[in-house]
């Protein structure tokens, strides 16, 4: 079994829980997810099966879309609704224009510091392990891309009795929406936290493409595997090059290829090689030999 499943991860499960259950449902060990979703977050989680596990990093690299609820006037230890309260502040009225000005400032390339309760590693340990032990450590900042921030709940002002607003966030990989909520609050002069989150898109997969674990189980029991997307779906945004039978045979053996073959795509960081409409391998420019391309991953198995 090879392909990609757009799973709808339900609230209360870890991404690893989903992989564990899918291994049982699909009767295969080769299952991998494409980027962790926190347990209290529901949403699109593409799952790679079989040879598609080789593509997990490329699927993870694609952009994401989230719908978040952000609450002003209270910050928490975890930057979301599960944490303990750190600070509170009564809200004076915040107009839609003031909120929009803050959103505009945070659109584009921004710098974030990951929350202490996160899986980012510092000195070989995950930040949440330090946090649970009550140890504060210096966290590495990271640059992330925020493509758009759109308020979804109208233009009413935010007040003490109405401190929550709904936001659609289109962003690049590695963005912490919890931290973005805190950053919006800081620009408005208030403590803030993310009170709810849903991922509505991950790469090329949207909410309406997804199946739940129960739906996948039901289909498997009926011997129906039409929910599997082909491997090619995972590299939709990657440059592609059609190859002939002679080159195909070389690629299966991981042979270096001349740069001249890649003239139409030579400036791309990586290229998907396609033979008879199927993904065979991913090649990239050789780091030392400028006239050659080398295999990054050979996807298709050589026939015995």
UniProtKB/Swiss-Prot annotation:
Keywords: Isomerase, tRNA processing. The keyword Acyltransferase does not apply. The active site is at 38 (nucleophile). It catalyses: uridine(55) in tRNA = pseudouridine(55) in tRNA. CDD domains: PseudoU_synth_EcTruB. One of its GO terms (biological process) is tRNA pseudouridine synthesis. GO terms for molecular function: RNA binding; tRNA pseudouridine(55) synthase activity. Its EC number is 5.4.99.25. InterPro entries: PsdUridine_synth_cat_dom_sf, PsdUridine_synth_N, tRNA_psdUridine_synth_TruB, TruB_C. The keyword Cell membrane does not apply. NCBIfam families: TruB (TIGR00431). Responsible for synthesis of pseudouridine from uracil-55 in the psi GC loop of transfer RNAs. Belongs to the pseudouridine synthase TruB family. Type 1 subfamily. This is tRNA pseudouridine synthase B.
């Amino acid at each position: 079994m090879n392909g990609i499943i757009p799973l709808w991860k339900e609230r209360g499960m870890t991404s690893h829980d989903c992989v564990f259950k899918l291994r049982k449902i699909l009767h295969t060990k080769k299952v991998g997810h494409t980027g962790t979703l926190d347990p209290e977050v529901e949403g699109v989680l593409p799952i790679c099966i079989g040879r598609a596990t080789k593509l997990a990093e490329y699927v993870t690299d694609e952009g994401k879309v989230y719908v978040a609820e952000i609450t002003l006037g209270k910050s928490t230890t975890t930057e979301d609704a599960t944490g303990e309260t750190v600070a509170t502040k009564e809200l004076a009225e915040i107009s839609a224009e003031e909120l929009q000005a803050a959103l505009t400032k945070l659109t584009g390339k921004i710098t974030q510091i990951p929350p202490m309760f996160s899986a980012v590693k510092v000195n070989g340990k995950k930040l949440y392990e330090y946090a649970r032990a009550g140890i504060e450590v210096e966290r590495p900042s990271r640059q992330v891309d925020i493509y758009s921030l759109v308020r979804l709940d109208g233009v009413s002002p935010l007040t003490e009795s109405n401190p929550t607003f709904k936001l659609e966030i289109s962003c690049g990989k590695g963005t912490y929406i919890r931290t973005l909520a805190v950053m919006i609050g800081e620009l408005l002069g208030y403590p803030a936290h993310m009170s709810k989150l849903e991922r509505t898109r991950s790469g090329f997969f949207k909410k309406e493409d997804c199946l739940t674990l129960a739906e996948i189980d039901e289909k498997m029991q009926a011997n129906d595997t039409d929910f599997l997307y082909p491997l090619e779906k995972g590299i939709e945004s990657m440059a592609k090059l059609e190859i002939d039978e002679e080159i195909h045979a070389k690629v299966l053996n991981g042979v270096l290829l001349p740069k001249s073959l890649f003239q139409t795509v030579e400036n791309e960081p990586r290229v998907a090689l396609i033979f008879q409409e199927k993904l065979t391998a991913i090649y990239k420019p050789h780091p030392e030999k400028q006239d050659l391309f080398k295999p990054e991953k050979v996807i298709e198995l050589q026939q015995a």
